[in-house]
Structures are given as structure tokens and as C-alpha cells.
Amino acid sequence: MEITVKKFVVGPLSTNTYLVHNESGDCIVFDPSLGCGAVLDEIDKSKLVPQAIVLTHGHFDHILGIDEILGKYAQIPVYIHPDEKIMLENPMYNGSIMMESPFTYEGTTCDLVEGKMRIGSFDTDVIVVPGHSPGGSAVKIDKYLFCGDILFAGSVGRSDLFGGDGQRLIDGIREKILVLPQNTVVCSGHGGRTTIGREIKENPYF
């Protein structure tokens, strides 16, 4: 089943929030940051049916919009890796302690588990790559890889924050991400798209 991917650049750190929908009109919201009004407008305009919020990791700029989405679609589950849950609950760990209003989310979550997962009506492959954060996860749907801050065009995620480990991040990307088909479209948490093939050839970290 073909999917459509729409990117919204939102929040204080220009985070990429992704709206992914299939031909049936079901959709997933990846990494909602602050100011998701345009995402909600698109869901309404296209008559989409939200299935889940999926969080690649728990840093504040990737979670600030959870309440905004759930304010309209309270019934949908929130997925995150278990090792990231402490970041949802602790503004020191998620980085929002430096904001005027530190953010926490203490609602129910569902676990992202490495391997094949059915999320709503979507068949996904979850790839766990710690190093930017304790349980950072990339989620592959069709040819698209939603990887948060694990891998960027020409770079990798920083590793100087809570749970960071630069070598573990590099090793994980090399062993789990760069082995994907080279036409895989990498949808990162910031910046533009790239492909696995391009990163193999051009990323100075590999």
C-alpha cells in the first residue's frame, strides 16, 4: 500500500513533524512539536483518521505537540521506546528545563519494540539505535525511514545529552541503518531528506 508523507517544520528548534497516511486515509503523526495546528488542519482537510502518535525519542522538541494532537484525538495511542519514557516524565532529561514552561507527558504510552510492528493499519519495521538518546528509534514504513535525530543528511545526531554515546550511535547507524536498501528515503528530525545510498557515499562519519 502506498503512503504519502507530509513534513511540517514546527516548534522552537524547527523540528520536522511528519504526517504519514495511506490510501485508506489512516494516518500517523511522527514527533509532534509545538504548534501543530497545520498538522491538524491537514488531517481535517484530507479527512484522515489518526491511528497513533509515534515518538522517535523523548527530547522536548519532538514531544511538545503531544497534548495538542491528543486534545482533538484523545483516543489514539502514543508509541515510544521504553528506555525513552523517563525523558517524557523529566524536564531535565528531555531538555525542556531551560524553557519558561518545562514540559512533561505522563499519559499512557505503548512500547516501540525492535522488529516488525503493526501500528494501527500500518506495517512498520522498528530499528532501535541508542546513542543520541537512550532508546532512540527509527521507524520504516514502505521506503521511508523516520529516524528522528539519529541520522541527518551529511551528519549524525549529537551525543552530549542525557543517555548519549557517540560511538554507540555511529556503530548502530552503520550496523542497522546503512544496511537498508539504498533507495530508502531518510526523513530526519531536522533538515531535508536524504537517502541511504547518498549517506553511504557522502556522510563524513562513515
Residue ranges and their predicted role:
Residues 34-117, 205:
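Active-site HxH/HxHxD metal-binding segment of metal-dependent hydrolases
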Residues 29-30, 51-58, 78-81, 128-131, ...:
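Active-site neighborhood of phospho(di)ester-bond hydrolases with catalytic His/Asp-centered motifs
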Residues 2-46, 138-148:
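Conserved beta-strand hairpin/beta-sheet module of binuclear metal-dependent hydrolase folds
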Residues 93-97, 123-206:
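Metallo-beta-lactamase
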Residues 8-9, 107-109, 128-130:
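Short Gly/Pro-enriched turn/cap motifs at secondary-structure boundaries
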Residues 6, 54, 125:
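Conserved Rossmann-like nucleotide-binding pocket used by diverse enzymes
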Residues 1-4, 96-99, 120:
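Short Pro/Gly-enriched beta-strand edge/turn motifs at strand-loop
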